[in-house]
């Protein structure tokens, strides 16, 4: 804790004052009679003697009379400022506060609409802020009067951020569950169908890059082979069997 320098310094000497008895015995405070103090309270223009002791013996300049013909005499303040009696005698006017009565406007008729209120409400309303992630990506708007077949779907253009997130998900898992697909669609503001199609196309590309056989083609060939085997086997058994008896 920091201490003051005069407490640390041992050479500091306390100031010594004379005792109280010396003040009463000596002439430090001049003794006055009780009438002296009562006269000070009664006389408002009393000034202390020290003010006059400060002045050297120069004479005060004579003051000219401020009283004109037909005017009352002016009052000189103790500091030498001239105060006219008219300013002292006339009271200051009190500020008057006039409150105008506020009459409420009559309500509009039943057939009329308050246009001013509508304009104020319209001006107070602001356009809602729509962020990019709140918008749906490439949603085709079909007119209600369209009576043709199903409109052609446009190709979805994924953003760089969406592609990056989908690539990271594909790196860890090439097949998504329904629950995970819903989570990704909600995070990237896409539909489940768009996520499903993107993963299908990405798996096809991955198989093509790694030169893997297509599972759809292989399954089709296996089904044709399994369906054609019974006919071939029956023909072979008939050819290899004994000749018919006469």
UniProtKB/Swiss-Prot annotation:
Q: Which UniProt keywords apply?
A: Developmental protein, DNA-binding, Homeobox, Nucleus, Transcription, Transcription regulation
Question: Where would I look for the motif Antp-type hexapeptide in this sequence?
Answer: 130-135
Ranges where the record places region Disordered = 23-125, 210-246
**What Pfam families would the database entry show?**
Homeodomain
Biological-process GO terms, alphabetical: anterior/posterior pattern specification; embryonic skeletal system morphogenesis; positive regulation of transcription by RNA polymerase II
Compartment(s) where it occurs, according to its Swiss-Prot or TrEMBL record? Nucleus
Query: Signal sequence span per UniProt?
Result: none
Q: Which PROSITE patterns match?
A: ANTENNAPEDIA, HOMEOBOX_1, HOMEOBOX_2
Q: Which Gene3D superfamilies does its entry note?
A: Homeodomain-like
Transmembrane spans: none
Quote the biased-composition stretches of kind Polar residues, using this chain's numbering. 39-48, 112-123, 216-239
State the Gene Ontology terms under molecular function: DNA-binding transcription factor activity, RNA polymerase II-specific; RNA polymerase II cis-regulatory region sequence-specific DNA binding
Keyword flag Transcription regulation: yes
Residue ranges of the annotated DNA-binding region, renumbered to this chain: 151-210
A cellular component annotation (GO) from this entry = nucleoplasm
Q: Would you identify the family this protein belongs to, as annotated? A: Belongs to the Antp homeobox family. Deformed subfamily.
Q: What does this protein do?
A: Sequence-specific transcription factor which is part of a developmental regulatory system that provides cells with specific positional identities on the anterior-posterior axis.
Q: What PANTHER family does this protein's entry cite?
A: HOMEOBOX PROTEIN HOX-B4 (PTHR45771:SF3), HOMEOTIC PROTEIN DEFORMED (PTHR45771)
* UniProt-recorded name of the protein: Homeobox protein Hox-B4a
Organism of provenance: Danio rerio (Zebrafish)
């Amino acid at each position: 804790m920091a201490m003051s320098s005069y407490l640390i310094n041992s050479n500091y000497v306390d100031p010594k004052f004379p005792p109280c008895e010396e003040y009463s015995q000596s002439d430090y405070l001049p003794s006055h009679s009780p009438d002296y103090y009562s006269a000070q309270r009664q006389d408002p223009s009393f000034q202390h003697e020290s003010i006059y002791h400060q002045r050297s013996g120069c004479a005060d300049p004579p003051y000219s009379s401020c009283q004109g013909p037909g005017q009352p005499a002016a009052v000189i303040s103790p500091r030498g400022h001239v105060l006219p009696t008219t300013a002292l005698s006339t009271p200051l006017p009190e500020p008057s506060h006039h409150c105008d009565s506020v009459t409420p406007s009559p309500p509009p008729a039943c057939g009329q609409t308050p246009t001013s209120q509508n304009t104020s409400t319209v001006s107070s309303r602001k356009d809602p802020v729509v962020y990019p992630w709140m918008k749906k990506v490439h949603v085709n708007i079909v007119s209600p009067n369209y009576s043709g077949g199903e409109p052609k779907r446009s190709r979805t253009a994924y953003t760089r951020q969406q592609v990056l997130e989908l690539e990271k998900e594909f790196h860890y898992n090439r097949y998504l569950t329904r629950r995970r697909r819903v989570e990704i669609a909600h995070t990237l503001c896409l539909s489940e169908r768009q996520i499903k199609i993107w993963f299908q196309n990405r798996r096809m590309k991955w198989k093509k890059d790694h030169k893997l056989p297509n599972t759809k083609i292989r399954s089709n060939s296996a089904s044709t082979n399994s369906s054609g085997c019974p006919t071939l086997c029956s023909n072979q058994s008939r050819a290899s069997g004994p000749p018919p008896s006469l």
